[in-house]
Every structure is written in structure tokens, then in C-alpha cells.
Amino acid sequence: MKEKINELAGRLLDLPDSILDLQMQLIDRSAELQKVESQIGERSSEIKYIINNALDDNGKKLYSNAELRDAAFISDAKDDILLPSLNVDRELIQSSIQSIRVKVENLSNHQRNIRVLISYLTTDSNIDNL
């Protein structure tokens, strides 16, 4: 039983480093997400600028109301080369962040469980049974 306690204690000592590694990955992925979201915002603004300044053959605004501009944005955003790619990148990064969060939560739960188990196994009433 002492071997099991030592094994659990060793695992307990290793878990903080594993959790820290994942948290650092989370920070990196969050920074990547911010960058991609910024790029999406910039590209969306560029598309909207073009739409807002589009003129017909008579020099009048091509999209005279918000509904037309919104429809043009949706259409142009779909046809854009960069924006769909950035949206896919954002979704992949968000999925990765969720996965890392689940792993951190799992390791944290594992850490708490080991602490409780070691505490239980090393109490005076239980140590006599070892």
C-alpha cells in the first residue's frame, strides 16, 4: 500500500506541471484567437468600406439603404478569398481552446481526487491497516 501512496504522491507532484503546460497553451491559443478576430474585423471593415463607397454609373450610391448594404456584405463576404479562411481558423482555434479547457479541468479534478485519496490513506485510523 505504501508503494501505491508513493505512486499517487509522485503523480500529484507531476500534475501541476502538466496543468501549467496546458494553461500556457491556452494563453497562446487565446492570443492567436485575438489576432484572427482582429483580422476578421479589419477585413470586414474593408469590405463594408468598399460597399459604402460603391457608386453606380450615374455617380449615386449603389447601396442606398442598410438592408441593401447588409445583403451586399453577406454576398461579398462569401465571395471574399480571405474572410472565409479566417472564419475557419477562428473556429478551429475556438475548438482547440475548448479542448484544452476540458483537459485542464480533468487534470484539476484528478489532482483533487488524488489529494483526497492520499489524505484518506494516510490518516491515523487507516495507516494502521497499511
Segments from the language model and where they lie:
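Short A/G/S/P-biased low-complexity tracts
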Residues: 8, 116-125
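Short, charge-rich amphipathic alpha-helices with coiled-coil/heptad character
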Residues: 1-28
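Short, glycine/alanine-rich amphipathic alpha-helical segment
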Residues: 56-94
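Long amphipathic alpha-helical coiled-coil segments
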Residues: 30-41, 81-119
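Extended alpha-helical coiled-coil "stalk/arm" regions
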Residues: 30-72
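Short acidic DE-rich linear segments
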Residues: 2-3, 123-130
